From Swiss-Prot:
Keywords: Disulfide bond, Endoplasmic reticulum, Glycoprotein, Glycosyltransferase, Golgi apparatus, Magnesium, Manganese, Membrane, Metal-binding, Signal-anchor, Transferase, Transmembrane, Transmembrane helix. The lineage of its organism: Eukaryota, Metazoa, Ecdysozoa, Arthropoda, Hexapoda. The gene is oxt. Residues 138-232 form the WSC domain. PROSITE patterns: WSC. It is found in: Endoplasmic reticulum membrane; Golgi apparatus membrane. This is Xylosyltransferase oxt. UDP-alpha-D-xylose binds at D287, T316, I317, W318, D419, W420, S502, R526, K527. It comes from Drosophila pseudoobscura pseudoobscura. Glycans are attached at N135, N139, N346, N700, N729. One of its GO terms (cellular component) is Golgi membrane.
Length: 880
């Protein structure tokens, strides 16, 4: 009877048991696979985290593998490439890069390098280090030693070569990782260590009797018996920096190498004010794509004899090999100059000092001739793989293309960490003027010209393997604000075939970390962006130099250029000029002047709140007098929230923009300038619950993207969970370009209600490729987009139809859109002005020059104007 009951029970619940077993098996599989899942990558490494435990490092890896594996592509033909490569390229990554590269020159460059690598004539196979090795001799066998499971003879690093182990392979790996000793065991195992094996553990050679899996003619230890070899290097110990200079020591002079990008001119001026002294040198490299910064900073050369801009400029993309090329070129320029200097320190506009210049000079004077770099602080082999040092990268078309795996040269130690360094003049002279007979340096230069993030490893590796190794100090003088969960989002995939990380901007909440630098040999912090947060910079300045007075003018204001009429104009400025010209016309009409030329657009923030952008333009009065005006404009998006919905009551900052920065959780298109080629992103803040006892809720929502014709163009499914803290979320849409110009609607809906609705403007274009649209075909190409992004077989849910226009309404609006898409000249301008006037508010205006008889305040007296006094960024004050 009991058996029959059991049988019935098993038959009844058999499907349930099978499902439970499957779920358990899947969980085990996922747990196993998760061991190898990495975090984010690169720019670097979190060198400040080097003191963490190995357990923490293992659970929070620094750099992720490439974002996706590549399928095996088909071979490329000469017709596809536009030329005949010199070999039949085999590497799948190289073929993929060739398929994606846009220009023929770039494809030829990739193919040439890929063929050279394939032929084995590109990289050096073996190099010889010139760092003193003490009493260690390469490849010397010390014999067979007894090992213990709980107390390894060589405990520095372990790996298992299942099919290829040999003493030589293990020696190469251990030397590369910086270990003086290598050991092979049990046929497949390789161990590395720093400590000399004890004589008491010595065994007869016959105890090591297992053949190597990679070479059966050689012996690779035994069962808990290890063949140990010397790698030929001594244990490396970084130098300890002195804290105070000896009495009577000559004070060093510093060459500050500023590598500048973007448009944050006032922050560059502010950095120069904090660092400036007549005895030091300030050499500035401005990215070759940044006309505005180069033009404005060039003015400093006439005022300051020790400030000079680099004439040979590079496009320094994230992770690019050009960054190392640029640094070496600038260092060479400094060596050729008349200036006398002892150290070069590279900084960006995102750096700021955390100690006074005098303290930095004292510290470096105590450490003359030493070189300050920050190592990765973790296992070298993991660093090599996560950093992509075992891959070849080629830079062209402002992109870093991954073209295949590579084997690093044997015989050298590999090191790396941060690309922010402080280098002595003798070392700079060595790396910038390699002698032909210096095979090591020549080979390393070639290696790192085809390396991702090369400046993060080049200087470290050269120091470790040359006669300069005794000058290595493991400190790059920086504290960096790493927040891995935010900073490692693979946000650089558009410029590099790899996943990358960046440090976060310092915020007021990070102040304790800045305060903690006081007793450490740290002199700079990064990153700072006043357009994200200026309050922390003010706090830092007051900590260093004393409090600002209450009368200090415009202390909490910040201005940053968006557009300047002297810039080289191309397609990137078409949208800005289209909207800017419209706002100029609207502001001119309001002031009763005839607008002539759009001069500048400038972002304005006060107390870290965005107050809009400033439109500066020239105009002519009815009397014939020429004047310049500046108008503050606030972008507006018209939103509605459901009044009675619990979710809507906690919804904030519901807006559509572009350039959403996941790291800083903000859309960097502050002016909300959206056009037919924009990649739209909706972002919002869901406020945390203040009632700890309230029941938790979750919401499954749908975001509808509705075009000016009332058609559904795309939708996103959103899942929002309750939280005790504010959550910033974003949702991208995939629309077909060009997007239809006009008033769009984003609706956030549930099953039966609308939670939020937002109307936003996709502005028509008045320019194309930097030139005004003058013909109907040109206008239709930019403003005539009427396509549908959804697939043809998409079935519209019945409950969504209430949010869209009827077919008749869509037909009528389509005819209107077709006509508008053909407009040029004044009719086009009137269409744009009508739309822009609804989504941008003209708040206030000022006049640049006195004596115009306009009833407007002078811009120099208007605290919001870009012409208002800004003493905190007034670099001319250094001349007084």
């Amino acid at each position: 009877m009991e058996q029959s009951v059991s049988a019935r029970w098993l038959r009844r619940y058999r499907p349930v048991l099978i499902i439970l077993v499957l779920i358990f098996g899947i969980q085990l599989f996922l747990a196993y696979k998760s061991v190898d899942i990495g975090g984010g990558s690169g720019s670097g490494l979190d060198v400040d985290a080097a003191q963490r435990s190995q357990r923490d490092l293992a659970s929070n890896p620094v750099i992720a593998e490439p974002p996706e594996s590549l399928p095996r592509p088909a071979r490329l033909t000469a017709n596809q490439l536009g030329f005949q490569p010199e070999c039949d390229i085999q590497a799948k990554e190289a073929i993929s890069a060739l398929q994606r590269a846009k220009t023929k020159d770039c494809r030829q460059h990739i193919a040439q390098i890929a063929c050279s690598i394939q032929a084995g004539r590109f990289y050096a196979i073996q190099l010889k280090s010139s760092c003193p090795s003490g009493n260690h001799t390469a490849n010397v066998s010390l014999g067979c030693y007894r090992d213990e499971k709980d107390r390894r003879l060589l405990g520095g690093y372990y790996t298992s070569f299942k099919n290829s182990n040999s003493p030589n392979l293990c020696l190469e790996l251990c030397l590369q990782s910086g270990y003086p000793y290598a050991g092979v065991q049990y046929g497949r195992e390789c161990f590395c260590g720093f400590d000399t094996p004890p004589k008491a553990a010595k065994l007869p050679d016959s105890s090591c009797n297992i053949k190597c899996l990679g070479n059966a003619r050689e012996i690779c230890g035994g069962f808990y018996a290890m063949n140990i070899y010397e790698t030929g290097i001594a244990k490396f110990t970084a130098q300890l920096a002195a804290s105070t200079p000896p009495t009577g020591a000559k004070r060093v002079r510093i060459a500050f190498l500023l590598t500048i990008n973007g448009r944050a001119l006032r922050q560059v001026h502010r950095l120069l004010k904090a660092l400036y002294a007549p005895e030091h040198v300030y050499y500035i490299h401005v990215d070759e794509r940044q006309d505005y910064l180069y033009r404005k900073l060039l003015e400093l050369e006439q005022k300051f004899p020790n400030i000079r801009l680099a004439r040979k400029r590079f496009s320094t993309i994230w992770g690019g090999a050009s960054l190392l090329t640029m640094l070496l070129q600038c260092m060479e320029d400094l060596l050729k100059s008349k200036w006398q200097w002892d150290f070069v320190i590279n900084l960006s506009e995102s750096d700021f000092p955390v100690k006074t210049l005098d303290k930095l000079v004292d510290f470096l004077s105590a450490n003359r001739g030493r070189n300050f770099v920050k190592g990765h602080g973790r296992e070298t082999q993991k660093f090599i793989q996560k950093q992509g040092l075992d891959r070849t990268f080629v830079e062209c078309d402002t992109h870093m293309w991954r073209i295949g795996d590579r084997k690093l040269p044997a015989g050298i130690q590999v090191d790396g960490g941060s690309d922010w360094v402080a280098l002595s003049r003798p070392f700079v002279a060595y790396v910038t003027h390699p002698k032909k007979e210096d095979e090591l340096l020549q080979a390393l230069l070639k290696l790192f010209r085809h390396t991702l993030l090369p400046a993060e490893s080049f200087f470290h590796t050269v120091l470790r393997n040359t006669h300069h190794c005794h000058t290595y100090v493991d400190n790059n003088l920086h504290v960096t604000n790493w927040k891995r969960k935010q900073g490692c989002k693979c946000q650089y995939k558009h410029v590099v075939d790899w996943c990358g990380c960046s440090p976060n901007d310092f915020m007021p909440d990070d102040w304790p970390r800045l305060l903690a630098t006081e007793q450490k040999s740290l002199f700079f912090a990064r990153k700072f962006e006043p357009i994200i947060n200026q309050a922390v910079l003010l706090q830092l300045e007051e900590w260093l130099y004393g409090p600002y007075t209450s009368e200090y003018l415009n202390l909490h204001g910040y201005w940053q250029s968006l557009y300047h009429h002297e810039d080289v104009h191309g397609s990137a400025d078409d949208l800005v000029r289209s909207v800017g010209d419209s706002l100029m016309r609207l502001a001119g009409s309001q002031a009763r002047v005839d607008p002539l030329e759009l001069l500048e657009l400038t972002h304005y923030l006060h107390r870290d709140q965005y107050k809009g952008f400033l439109v500066r333009f020239s105009a002519r009065r009815a009397t014939g007098q020429d004047v310049q005006l500046e108008t503050r404009v606030r972008p507006v998006q018209h939103g509605k929230l459901a009044r009675n919905a619990r979710f809507s009551k906690r919804l904030r900052n519901f807006e559509v923009s572009t350039d959403f920065d996941q790291k800083e959780q903000v859309a960097r298109n502050f002016g909300k300038l959206l056009g037919p080629q924009s990649d739209l992103v909706l972002s919002y803040t869901y406020q945390g619950s203040t009632d700890s006892g309230a029941a938790s809720h979750s919401y499954n929502l749908t975001l509808l993207w509705i075009d000016p014709l009332g058609r559904l163009q795309d939708f996103n499914e959103l899942h929002v969970e309750d939280s005790s803290t504010d959550l910033i979320n974003h949702s991208k849409t995939l629309l077909s370009h060009p997007i239809t110009p006009g008033v769009w609607t984003a609706k956030l809906i549930g099953r039966s209600s609308i939670y939020a609705q937002l109307k936003f403007l996709i502005s028509p274009m008045a320019y194309g490729n930097g030139e005004p649209l003058e013909t109907t075909p040109e206008a239709e190409k930019r403003n005539g987009g009427l396509g549908i992004a959804l697939p043809d077989d998409f079935e519209l849910p019945v409950e969504w139809q209430q949010h869209l226009h009827t077919d008749d309404e869509q037909f009528s609006l389509r005819e209107e859109a077709l006509a508008n898409g053909k407009l040029t000249g004044p009719p086009l301008h009137r269409w744009i002005d009508d739309l822009v006037g609804k989504f941008f508010q003209l708040r206030e205006s000022c006049v640049v020059d006195a004596g115009t008889e306009l009833s407007l305040p002078l811009c120099s007296d208007a605290p919001w104007s870009s012409l208002a006094p800004d003493p905190k960024s007034d670099v001319d004050a250094l001349l007084k």
